[in-house]
A protein has these predicted regions:
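N-terminal compositionally biased, intrinsically disordered segments and leader/signal-like regions
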Residues: 193, 227-229, 245-246
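Compositionally biased regions
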Residues: 7, 33, 38-40, 138, ...
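Conserved beta-strand-loop-alpha-helix hinge in the C-terminal portion
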Residues: 211-237
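Long, low-complexity, intrinsically disordered segments
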Residues: 247-267
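Short, solvent-exposed coil/turn linker segments
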Residues: 65, 129-132, 217, 225, ...
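ABC family nucleotide-binding domain
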Residues: 1-204, 209
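Short, low-complexity interaction segments enriched in Ser/Thr/Pro/Gly
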Residues: 7, 232, 245-247, 261
């Protein structure tokens, strides 16, 4: 098992951003994480990325108990095990695409322009290597970010709303890259409000008020996926209280995060 969370809580005063969450992610799985704003998705990603620590519970990543590691060891995991992709591009404006990828190489104490160029080629941007971010479309900028995240050949890629700022065409280009990574055995955890993006994962989980309240598996059949809902009605105490239930959670433009994806309008 690549990732194991056991009874993890993250508490800020009276707020339980994560509330007794247990989760296992096998090596090579594509996991989609959905839920309304404030459900704990980003907190979960920060803890898995070694950028935050749980108040209670334990997290094991790649066989190591994160709570027992010192700062240098956590930095080593961030450098060598994890690749991060965010909704915001965070590219350095005065550096070219290939130089932005090489920034990650500096973090790994090595620079190799040839490898950085190969990373851009792998995301379809070989002909944009010398372009500044201002000369790239939003989709191209996001693909530079993906190339940068993959430069350390991570075992797990964490993507927080990676297509949130993209139109349908560029969204599909990013999803195609993720599909290739998945086929190569890379573990993916993707936070999204988009039901189409979520449906690309092998498995979807639904968070509500920091708790896991729904799960859905997808089985590939010659490129087509059929889905089975698991334990969706087995909600923890409080999920049916004053807040919304798992079945009722809605994003801004999707009626059912774990339902069938609706056709997406061109943006």
């Amino acid at each position: 098992m690549l990732l194991e969370l056991s009874h993890v809580s993250k508490i800020y005063g009276d707020l339980h951003a994560l509330d007794d969450l247990s989760l296992e992610v096998p090596r090579g799985q594509w996991l989609s994480v959905v839920g309304s704003s404030g459900s704990g998705k980003t907190t979960l990603m920060n803890i898995v990325a070694c950028m935050d620590t749980p108040t209670k519970g334990s997290v094991r990543l790649d066989g190591r108990e994160l709570g027992s590691l010192n700062a240098a060891q956590l930095t080593d995991i961030r450098k060598n095990v994890i690749g991060l992709v965010f909704q915001q591009f965070h590219l350095i404006g005065h550096l070219t695409a290939v130089e932005n990828v090489m920034v990650a190489q500096y973090y790994h104490s090595m620079t190799d322009e040839k490898e950085a160029l190969e990373a851009l080629e792998n995301v379809g941007l070989a002909d944009r290597a010398d372009h500044l971010p201002s000369q790239l479309s939003g989709g191209e900028q996001q693909r530079v970010c993906i190339a940068r995240a993959l430069i350390n050949h991570p075992e797990i890629v964490l993507a927080d709303e990676p297509t949130g700022n993209l139109d349908e065409t560029n969204e599909q280009l990013v999803l195609d890259i993720f599909s290739r990574l998945h086929e190569q055995g890379t573990t993916l955890i993707v936070v999204t409000h988009d039901s189409h993006v979520a449906s690309c994962g092998q498995r979807q989980i639904l968070l509500n008020h920091g708790r896991l309240v729904g799960e859905k598996l997808s089985e590939g059949d010659e490129g087509r996926r059929t889905s089975t809902m698991l334990d969706f009605d087995d909600k923890p105490p409080g999920a049916d209280g004053g807040g919304t239930t798992g079945a009722e959670i809605k994003s801004a433009d999707e009626a059912d995060p774990l339902g069938e994806p609706e056709p997406k309008e061109q943006r």
